[in-house]
Curated annotation (Swiss-Prot):
Intramembrane region(s): 904-939
Binding sites annotated in the UniProt record for Ca(2+) 2: 782, 785, 808, 811, 1003
UniProt region (Disordered), positions on chain: 481-505, 1126-1165
GO process annotations (BP): calcium ion transmembrane transport; metal ion transport; monoatomic cation transmembrane transport; positive regulation of insulin secretion involved in cellular response to glucose stimulus
Regulation: Ca(2+)-activated cation channel. Regulated by PI(4,5)P2 levels. PI(4,5)P 2 reverses the Ca(2+) -induced desensitization of channels. TRPM5 is temperature-sensitive and activated by heat. Heat activation is due to a shift of the voltage-dependent activation curve to negative potentials. The channel is blocked by extracellular acidification.
Phosphoserine, modified sites: 129
Lineage: Eukaryota, Metazoa, Chordata, Craniata, Vertebrata
Recorded catalytic activity of this chain's protein: Na(+)(in) = Na(+)(out); K(+)(in) = K(+)(out)
Quaternary structure and interacting proteins, as annotated: Homotetramer.
Main location (coarse class): membrane
Name used for this protein in its record: Transient receptor potential cation channel subfamily M member 5
Source organism: Homo sapiens (Human)
Encoding gene, per UniProt annotation: TRPM5
């Protein structure tokens, strides 16, 4: 058994080797306007089939076949029915195209092969793809080829001209079919050796059936060879008999006439196959021909041999059962031929591989997975790989439903092979290749000799490159993926990025089973843009909300790298976001508390990343706009205070903290403190939690420390401390404090800048020093936000994330300008420059106030509108500047051609046209009657020069045109752009506002309770806690928490159950859709048609039984007549002869018909 992966360049060798083998290759140009060209080879009848097969692959570069259809039939002109013509022209060519098949047919333009050639021609003319073509190889005996001498005298390097005759044949000679492109011409063999063409074709079919090929170059499927019988004369029986002895399956088209109809009538009743019955069939199918009794007897023997291999024969009637396509019929014929009576799964693998290669999951369900065989996971591993590589999600689902265990199937080695099988034209292949090249150059820089030269052959990607690609897309959400699976290393991976030893590979055992097989397959499918398969893996895996959001993030990043497919990826990204949103809706409707916990729990499969973090990275605005997420954010925003508390009450408590201990502000009911062991154990259930917003660990600590606090300070001290923390720790209070203090900061800045800004040495004054200190506390807070937020992140990445926020950039600019302004202000020589810089800095600090509007439902979306309009203005200014410069330079050249002063040139070229847009038109320069200037040299130095009046009319015309374009056209264009931007944002105003609201709540949730300048106390507290290694207050626990293992598993199981409910509802909606109802109706109609076809088959069997009964009654009547004609010895003799006759007929024996004197058949009775 050999693997066929494609052309093998070493077989056969050069032209001299081919001549030694008797091969003479050449090219032929057919006449006519089409200028068709074909390749041919003249071979001896005894050539080895392996040499011929290698010639087709290596020399002619034909793609390795997944199926070979050998067309056998009538080689003389005959009347073809319309349905049979459609089967050949549409069904056969379509089946060959869809399955990657070769068609072996006659090379002569006559009979059945003529129609096949026309079908191939029509397909080549209609097809727009050069990659998908139908391979039709014509074989013929050289002795039957018209213009044979032209082909015999052809040289290999010089194409010969072959005349194309309209008739196609002259007596027994026929011309080559110009619709084919490859010809095998068999030279006549020695006399008495029979038909060399038939012998060679049989040996070639046998050799091809012993080769292996497969989709994707897997080389795991035996190449099936199917013989298709259409019409045919009785001499075809010898060909069929020898083929079935080689276990070649046959598909017989009923109604095509000739020997095909004879076989169709006799294949189901081999016990009645006697010469008399065969003769009757031959006379019916060939009424114009006369056959000798010796031929009848010989053909009857062949028919008996053929019908004894019924498992290789498939009879199909397209006139009555025409609802199925020919490729389906072919696959069923192959399944029937290779089907064994054994119940071992190994005996069904080849037919299962064929079904996978041809994507016929319906046949796999009905013929293979019908309950007769018990499949094990190990039996389906090979076909599972084929289905994954060739993107057959329905087969993957079928295998999983019938015993395939993905946990046992997916090892890291097999996952690595899946990534190595990605298409070379995909974006993933380019990314992996780029990462591999970066690693090679890194190792080369370290002096590794083997890494200096690029590896030969196709790139062998490893999971190391995959993990680096995923890290670019998912950042911290894939930390530790595909690294050493030892527990210690896994814990280190969760805490921080793993550091690989210099010059070493990842220590990952490729034989180890994947810890999260569904997640790994899901990522593999998403990276390859296989949406249907990825959706199935998502449905089968855990942590569905997090997985869908991770897919959103991946597709968003990939769309930035591949702009051509950005629209398609955006559609799929929205689909995954919809999956996450719908699944969370299902969870939220079932349990609000568990849904909140789902948002903040650290997902085990995604490197301890929360759903909120993934949604932020994926910019999933629709997810944040969900009512459940907003309800959770509302609880976080108000903390333990009652939601909806009036702002005036909050402001009163902020200005007078003693009011916190009154009933001015309502706090949540405080549950009685429980410190028993049973109470602590109750925390394992989410349903027993009073509020799911705070971390379980903090609640346990409160319960443990409660008796100590009561013992030390008493209940009143506990009440005062708890109320104080609840008020000042709420994000709404932090936000209010920052807003109030920021207004105070701006008021102080205004006072200093306008009233108390003294030059040195009198200044700076006390209020100005207070302003410096205030800005110093602002700087400390920005440093904390940039470098002291997440301990598990590198400083460079922290700074990158900090700079990525636009408001942080605004803060950096404001602080930088303030430092520059203060530095200049301290120098007497640069005092005015310092005032100028500080004045500009005040404007930046004031614009920073816009950020607080994000919490307002009406004003929040307007910030997005302003931001997008600024981008629109940038592109608008490009068009405006083109007209501005063109008009300004032209008018300057016409009005002031001799004025070379640079400041005046700039003023007239740019500044004056810009003012003219707003209506300030200098008539004293344009209107000749209003010109007022002097040409005196002493007055000309500081005053404008007199304009030139030579082309005054042209300047006025240019002014009119300029005002028309800028004031009417461009301004209206800008208004239209602004209107479109406003409509887009306003249409999604609620979604934009809710997303902004989330970012604002998270920001102030993580900020210290005190606002600048008092925030310095909070910074000192954090510093002291770090110095004394005392654990700081983890407000982050409200947005990220680690659940105990039993509780975490309970949440995961609950989410999985909700996902199953969601998928069942989706399936129900799909079943109730109009398209699905129509599909089911069509399926039922097909079922009824098949049922009626079965009734026709039963009717045929009844008629067959009636004919058999009639035949037996005739025999019985003849015996009775013989017995009734005489008595005595003569009667006995006749009786014995009659008995022998009946016995011989029922045995089906042929010896009695070959006795001397029995050359003629008995008369019909």
């Amino acid at each position: 058994m050999q693997d066929v992966q494609g052309p093998r360049p070493g077989s056969p060798g050069d032209a001299e080797d081919r001549r030694e083998l008797g091969l003479h290759r050449g090219e032929v140009n057919f006449g006519g306007s089409g200028k068709k060209r074909g390749k041919f080879v003249r071979v001896p009848s005894g050539v080895a089939p392996s040499v011929l097969f290698d010639l087709l692959l290596a020399e002619w570069h034909l793609p390795a076949p997944n199926l070979v259809v050998s067309l056998v039939g009538e080689e003389q002109p005959f009347a073809m029915k319309s349905w049979l013509r459609d089967v050949l022209r549409k069904g056969l060519v379509k089946a060959a195209q869809s399955t990657g098949a070769w068609i072996l047919t006659s090379a002569l333009r006559v009979g059945l092969a003529r129609h096949v050639g026309q079908a191939v021609r029509d397909h080549s003319l209609a097809s727009t793809s050069t990659k998908v073509r139908v391979v039709a190889v014509g074989m013929a005996s050289l002795g039957r080829v018209l213009h044979r001498r032209i082909l015999e005298e052809a040289q290999e390097d010089f194409p010969v001209h072959y005349p194309e005759d309209d008739g196609g044949s002259q007596g027994p000679l026929c011309s080559l079919d110009s619709n084919l492109s490859h010809f095998i011409l068999v030279e006549p063999g020695p006399p008495g050796k029979g038909d060399g063409l038939t012998e060679l074709r049989l040996r070639l079919e046998k050799h091809i059936s012993e080769q292996r090929a497969g989709y994707g170059g897997t080389g795991s499927i035996e190449i099936p060879v199917l013989c298709l019988l259409v019409n045919g004369d009785p001499n075809t029986l010898e060909r069929i008999s020898r083929a079935v002895e080689q276990a070649a399956p046959w598909l017989i088209l009923v109604g095509s006439g000739g020997i095909a109809d004879v076989l169709a009538a006799l294949v189901n009743q081999p016990h009645l196959l006697v010469p008399k019955v065969a003769e009757k069939q031959f006379k019916e199918k060939f009424p114009s021909k006369h056959f000798s009794w010796e031929d009848i007897v010989r053909w009857t023997k062949l028919l008996q041999n053929i019908t004894s291999h019924q498992h290789l024969l498939t009879v199909y009637d397209f006139e009555q059962e025409g609802s199925e396509e020919l490729d389906t019929v072919i696959l069923k014929a192959l399944v029937k031929a290779c089907k064994s009576h054994s119940q071992e799964p190994q005996d069904y693998l080849d037919e299962l591989k064929l079904a996978v290669a041809w994507d016929r999951v319906d046949i796999a369900k009905s013929e293979i997975f019908n309950g007769d065989v018990e499949w094990k996971s190990c039996d389906l591993e090979e076909v599972m790989v084929d289905a994954l590589v060739s993107n057959k999600p329905e087969f993957v689902r079928l295998f999983v439903d019938n015993g395939a265990d993905v946990a046992d199937f997916l090892t890291y080695g097999r996952l690595q092979e899946l990534y190595r099988s990605v298409s070379r034209k995909s974006l993933l292949f380019d990314l992996l290749q780029r990462k591999q090249e970066e690693a090679r150059l890194t190792l080369a820089g370290l002096g590794t000799q083997q890494a200096r030269e690029p590896p030969a052959g196709p790139p062998a990607f490893s999971l190391h490159e995959v993990s680096r690609v995923l890290k670019d897309f998912l950042q911290d959400a894939c930390r530790g993926f595909y690294q050493d699976g030892r527990p210690g290393d896994r814990r280190r991976a969760e805490k921080g990025p793993a550091k690989r030893p210099t010059g070493q590979k990842w220590l990952l055992d490729l034989n180890q089973k994947s810890e999260n097989p569904w997640r790994d397959l899901f990522l593999w499918a998403v990276l390859q843009n296989r949406h249907e398969m990825a959706t199935y893996f998502w449905a089968m895996g855990q942590e569905g909300v997090a997985a869908a959001l991770a897919a959103c993030k991946i597709l968003k990043e990939m769309s930035h790298l591949e702009t051509e497919a950005e629209a398609a990826r955006a559609t799929r990204e929205a689909k995954y976001e919809r999956l996450a949103l719908d699944l969370f809706s299902e969870c939220y409707s079932n349990s609000e508390a568990r849904a909140f916990a789902l948002l903040v729990r650290r997902n085990r499969c995604w490197s301890k990343t929360t759903c909120l973090h993934l949604a932020t990275e994926a910019d999933a605005k629709a997810f944040f706009a969900h009512d459940g997420v907003q309800a959770f954010l509302t609880r976080i925003w108000w903390g333990d205070m009652a939601a909806g508390t009036p702002i005036l009450r909050l402001l009163g408590a902020f200005l007078c903290p003693a009011l916190v201990y009154t009933n001015l502000i309502t706090f949540s009911e405080e549950a009685p403190l429980r410190t028993g062991l049973e109470d602590l154990q109750d925390l394992d259930s989410l349903d027993t939690e009073k509020s799911p917003l705070y971390g379980l660990q903090s609640r346990v600590e409160e319960l443990v420390e409660a008796p100590r606090a009561q013992g030390d300070r008493g209940p009143r001290a506990v009440f005062l401390l708890t109320r104080w923390r609840k008020f000042w720790g709420a994000p709404v209070t932090v936000f209010l404090g920052n807003v109030v203090m920021y207004f105070a900061f701006l008021f102080l800045f205004t006072y200093v800048l306008l009233v108390d800004f003294r030059p040195p040495p009198q200044g700076p004054s006390g209020p100005e020093v207070t302003l410096y200190f205030w800005v110093f506390t602002l700087v400390l807070e920005e440093i904390r936000q940039g470098f002291f937020t997440d301990e598990d992140t590198h400083l460079v990445k922290k700074f990158t994330l900090y700079v990525g926020d636009n408001w942080n950039k605004c803060d950096m600019v404001a602080i930088f300008l303030f430092i520059v302004g203060v530095t200049c202000r301290m120098l007497p020589s640069a005092f005015e420059a310092g005032r100028t810089v500080l004045a500009m800095d005040f404007m930046v600090f004031t614009l920073r106030l816009i950020h607080i509007f994000a919490i307002h439902k009406q004003l929040g979306p307007k910030i997005i509108v302003v931001e997008r309009m600024m981008k629109d203005v940038f592109f608008f200014l490009f068009f405006l500047s083109v007209w501005l410069v063109a008009y300004g330079v032209t008018t300057q050249a016409l009005l002031h051609p001799h004025d070379g002063r640079l400041e005046w040139i700039f003023r007239r070229v740019l500044y004056r046209p810009y003012l003219q847009i707003f209506g300030q038109i200098p008539l004293d320069e344009i209107d000749e009657a209003r010109v007022n200037c002097s040409t005196h040299p002493l007055l000309l130095e500081d005053s404008p020069s007199c304009p030139s009046l030579y082309a005054n009319w042209l300047v006025i015309l240019l002014l009119v045109t300029f005002l028309l374009v800028t004031n009417v056209l461009l301004m209206n264009l800008l208004i239209a752009m602004f209107s479109y931007t406003f409509q887009v944002v306003q249409g999604n105003a609620d979604m934009f506002w809710k997303f902004q609201r989330y970012n604002l709540i998270v920001e102030y949730h993580e900020r210290p309770a005190l606002a600048p300048p008092f925030i310095l106390l909070s910074h000192l507290s954090l510093t002291l806690r770090r110095v004394f290694k005392k654990e700081a207050e983890h407000k982050r626990e409200h947005l990220e928490r680690d659940l105990p293992d039993p509780l975490d598993q309970k949440v995961v199981t609950w989410e999985t159950v909700q996902k199953e409910n969601f998928l069942s509802k989706m399936e129900k909606r799909r079943r109730d859709s109009e398209g699905e109802v129509l599909r089911k109706t069509a399926h039922r109609v097909d079922f009824i048609a098949k049922y009626l076809g079965g009734l026709r088959e039963q009717e045929k069997r009844i008629k067959c039984l009636e004919s058999q009964i009639n035949y037996c009654s005739v025999l019985v009547s003849s015996v009775a007549d013989v017995l009734a004609q005489g008595g005595g010895p003569r009667s006995s003799q006749h009786c014995g002869e009659g008995s022998q006759l009946v016995a011989a007929d029922h045995r089906g024996g042929l010896d009695g018909w070959e006795q001397p004197g029995a050359g003629q058949p008995p008369s019909d009775t």
